[in-house]
Amino acid sequence: MKTLTFFGPKYGTQVSLLSPNVVSKLSRFPLTSFARKPTKPVCVKTTDCDLVESQRTFNKFPRSDWGDHFLRLPFNVSDMDMLTIEMNALKSTIRKMLMYSQDVEETKERILIIYLLVALGMAYHFEDEIDDNLKHGFENIETTMAGENDLSTVSVMFWVFRTYGYNLSSDMFRRFKGEDGKFEECHTKDVKGLLSLYEAAQLGTSTEDILDEAMSFSSSHLECLAGGTCPPHISRLIQNELYMPQHHNAEILFASEYISFYKQEDVHNKVLLEFAKLNFKFLQLHWIHELKILTKWWNDQDLLSKLPPYFRDRMVECHLYAVIYYFEPQYSFGRIMLAKLLVLLTVVDDTCDRYGSVPEVAKLLDCVERWDPELGESLPDYLKTVFKFTLDVFEDCERAGKSEEGLSFNVDGALAEWAAAEKVPTVEEYLEVGGVAVTMYATIALGLLGLGPKAREHGYEWLKSRPKLVHDLATKGRLMNDMGGFKDDIGRGFLANVVNYYMKEYGTTEEETYKEFHKIVRDLEKSVNSEFLKINKGVPREILSRALNCGKMIDVTYRSGDGYTRPRGKFTEYVESLFVEHMDAPVMQYASSSTL
């Protein structure tokens, strides 16, 4: 039986993905690590499992700020029905916009519309029309692009084709260079052209120097323009893009911002804008309904009163991850299940890394491996609670009918041994072992449970092949996680951090190390782009997009420190933009404003 191996920061874990025809317990997944950053230390330090719990050193976490917020929000199924009627009334108009023709200018216009569908978060409604247009468009791309000298148009078309896996040549950007081989200065005031060029450059591979030049050229001028005389909504878009490019942002998070931007544009398509509003509201009602279910479920578990406050209370944030993984309405059940499993991973991970002693955690993992409720009686009281919670979550998922694939725990202590013995591995060794410790493989595989049987089977077989794309995403996650948590890790005596290892191995300063890691991250992103272009025809987009979305979770979480452990700030803004904002607008407002 082939296996995928996962390691956590304190207790590495190995997981076996059983073939789909093996009937066993539902998906017993490994303990892997989100970020591991302390907040306020309490009690006194001990490593003896026989000492009473009141003497434990652990980092106290406050309760979630969200509490019962989503339980109190109104929800009416009839609102969703009304929104569906309104959207259906507009769909035919948009489909007409996407009708194929051989006219060159109309082809360009349709590709630009496809970009808007993606940017506004509603491309999933028109997948067949998009695929048909891109297939025919790519076959005639030379004719279509001949003589096109608008920087924004060329950049957007490049972005669309590359995003959908078509290897459009980056040589088309040479038309914007002068005789000196540099991008012409006449483009420095073209705000939309620079924005589009900056986004196009994000999709470059390691062999495309021209896109590196494009990124440097566009970013330097955009930084100047952002603080200049641009209209406020354009300045904000520039700032958002420079902070988190669209290519690295979650599609629906970008859409929540872009809808606000697009409606302030002097020239915009009213049908597309109206549909975007209706669609976002429709999705939001789905998410709110899911959060109601999850909040009630979390309250029923009552772990906040049963366990010491050593674990992160992140149910809402776990649902945000599930939305990033798949935001479309048909994945509602999958989001609920994935959120529960991510909450479980967080609780068990924090138990292992932040509170439990080595012998205690070994007992817990043995109980999970054997999957015998009676064995839990030998555990300390707090671990009985954790073990029961583990059993309950998986049985909850099993009752929901998702019990075809089995995943089993198996402990491996590589990182724990390094940390305990103060062994300093090479950076390459650490990344090979710790590369998936930020739940990359785990989250991809868990989320596949929400797809159909064929997609799940294909996805699991692909993961078992240890694809380079996923490995690169996991390595990027390891680097960004450890950069964000270096000071906190060292402050609490946890030396198993790639920044620490790199500094010791190469004799660099912290600043030099971070600078080098940012280069490595960019190289990994190029490698992911390259792998996507290579394999997208052999692996269904439904699966590949989930892996890429997990990569976007990394950027959303670690772009400004550690958003999962300390969600206040930018991470909270993401939660609010999807689940809180726009809620004041009643459904009837959308219904009445859809007349064009």
Swiss-Prot record:
EC number: 4.2.3.-
Locations listed in the record: Cytoplasm
Main localization category: cytoplasm
Required cofactor names: Mg(2+); Mn(2+)
Chain residues that bind Mg(2+) 1: D349, D353
Pfam family, one: Terpene_synth_C
Gene Ontology molecular function: cyclase activity; magnesium ion binding; terpene synthase activity
Name of the protein in question: Putative terpenoid synthase 5
